[in-house]
C-alpha cells in the first residue's frame, strides 16, 4: 500500500484529524482531487486565499465560515461578539452541521487565530462545545516550508 493509499484509507475509515504534507510535486493536489471524487463523506474544501481556493476547487475560509477579515482574539467575550455579529444564512448553517470532513489546503498560510476561530464556529453550530472542531474530521494539507500566514496591514500593527 502506497503512502497515498494509506492516507486515503485513513481519511475514509476514521474520524481522526490528519496533516498531509510534502514538497511541491509530491501529489498533494492529486490526492485531494481523488478524495473529492471518491470520498462519500460530506466534505468542504477551503483555503486561506482566493487563488489557493480556486486551485483546490474549493472556497475561501472566510467565505465558508462568514468571517470578517480581522484577527480573532481567543477570549470568550470575543467569541460571543463574533457569534452575535455573525449573520449566517440557514443553508450555510446546515452545511456546517452536516459537515463530516473539512479539508484546509495551503494550511501553512492559515494563522493560528483563524484556525482557533474555525474550531469555535464548528463547535458552536454543531452544538458540541467540548469536542474539537465540533466533531468534524479535519484534513489539513500543505508544506510548512512554503508560504507563511498572510497578515494585512492592521494586523501587523498589533
Where are these regions (language model features)?
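Conserved ATP-binding/catalytic motifs of P-loop helicase motor domains
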Residues: 1-158
Amino acid at each position: 500500500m502506497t503512502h497515498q493509499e494509506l492516507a486515503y484509507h485513513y481519511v475514509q475509515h476514521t474520524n481522526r484529524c490528519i496533516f498531509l504534507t510534502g514538497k511541491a510535486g509530491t501529489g498533494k493536489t492529486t490526492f485531494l482531487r481523488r478524495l473529492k471524487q471518491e470520498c462519500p463523506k460530506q466534505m468542504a474544501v477551503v483555503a486561506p486565499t482566493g487563488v489557493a481556493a480556486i486551485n483546490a476547487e474549493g472556497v475561501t475560509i472566510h467565505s465558508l465560515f462568514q468571517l470578517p477579515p480581522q484577527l480573532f482574539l481567543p477570549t470568550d467575550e470575543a467569541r460571543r461578539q463574533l457569534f452575535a455579529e455573525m449573520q449566517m444564512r440557514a443553508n450555510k448553517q446546515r452545511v456546517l452541521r452536516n459537515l463530516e470532513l473539512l479539508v484546509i489546503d495551503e494550511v501553512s498560510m492559515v494563522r493560528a487565530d483563524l484556525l482557533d476561530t474555525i474550531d469555535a464556529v464548528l463547535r458552536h453550530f454543531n452544538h458540541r462545545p467540548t469536542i474539537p472542531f465540533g466533531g468534524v474530521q479535519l484534513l489539513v494539507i500543505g508544506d510548512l516550508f512554503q508560504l507563511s500566514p498572510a497578515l494585512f496591514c492592521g494586523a501587523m500593527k498589533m
